[in-house]
Each structure stands twice: as C-alpha cells, then as structure tokens.
Amino acid sequence: SPNTPGLRELQEKDSLRKILTHLQSENLKFDPSTGSGPKPILLKIAPDLTYEQIDDVIDLALEIRLDGLVAANTTISRENLLTHTSKLEAIGAGGLSGLPLKQRSTEVVKYICDKTEARPDDPFGRGKIPVIASGGIFTGEDAKEKINAGASLVQVWTGFIYEGPGI
C-alpha cells in the first residue's frame, strides 16, 4: 500500500523471500484435525517495480511455487495526469488506480508472461505461472487487451466501483 510508509520495501527480493518462504511453509502443512490443506497463494505486485525487480519476483514465485501473480496493484506515479500538481499535493500520498494504471499494468502482464514462457500443454499458451491482470479494466476491450497480453484472468475493481454492475 502506498499509504503505509516502508511497506513497498517488502517487495524487495530479500524481504519478499523471507515472507513468502515462511508463508508457503506454513501453508503446505496439512492439519488432520481440520482436514484443511494448502490454499492458493498469489502475490499482487506494484506497477512501479523495475524490470529487474519483476524478474526477482518471477524467480521467487517459481522457486517458492506460488499459485499466481497479480499485476498490478496501485501506483505511486502521477505521470501524465491532467490534475494540477497543487491539487495532487493537497490530496496527498496514496495509491492511484483505474485508467492511469491501464498501460503499465498491461506492460507488466506481458513482461511476466513473456518471461515465464508459454506452456505447450496450455491451449491458450499461458506461462509457467498464472497471471491475473488488474488495473485500468473498464470495458470488455480492456479485459481482452489483458488476455491478449497473456493474462489468465482479469480482476476488475475500480471500473466496477465507477461503472457499477453494468460494466
């Protein structure tokens, strides 16, 4: 969350490895008293990561056997916004979602899918790890763009909030 100081540092390789290794270790423990087994673990990443940082995330996700990646969370970038700088400063820090995130989200989805290579057993040619696209999805065309970039699924939130169930 961009609203929490220092929280994004947890997406750095060493911090992320500690967290995900422990989480997956606990997740894989079977509890016979409840009959519960492992639950899917997906990691939602920031669109502000560099490609080197995304490579680190991909490597960790495959190494630790995460069930998927979600690209991408809210951004701290304010580039290309029409809102005047003084108004942005008055609003303060926080994550930006929706349409301003659309292009970067698609770029991150495509990058992850390209880096994880298509599996021959997947009729849709998806990569070694499922990627859920999130960010800037307001129309069916937006969803199609994410799928064409390699996403296995799309996650709609801001579009749903602004457009309602008729999205």
Residue ranges of predicted features:
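Generic structural signal for well-ordered alpha-helices
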Residues: 13-24, 54-59, 106-110, 143
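Glycine- and other small-residue-rich loops at beta-strand/loop junctions that grip anionic moieties
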Residues: 8, 43-46, 98-101, 132-136, ...
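Glycine-rich phosphate-binding active-site loops on the catalytic face of alpha/beta enzymes
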Residues: 68-78, 137, 143-167
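Loop-centered beta-sheet repeat module
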Residues: 1-34, 42-44
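Alpha-helical structural signal in soluble globular domains
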Residues: 22-26, 30, 59-64, 111, ...
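Short beta-strand/loop segments at the ligand-binding rim of alpha/beta enzyme cores
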Residues: 28-49, 114-133
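Catalytic cores of alpha/beta
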Residues: 49-63, 118-127, 137-154
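Glycine/Thr-rich beta-alpha phosphate-binding loop at enzyme active sites
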Residues: 2-15, 66-129
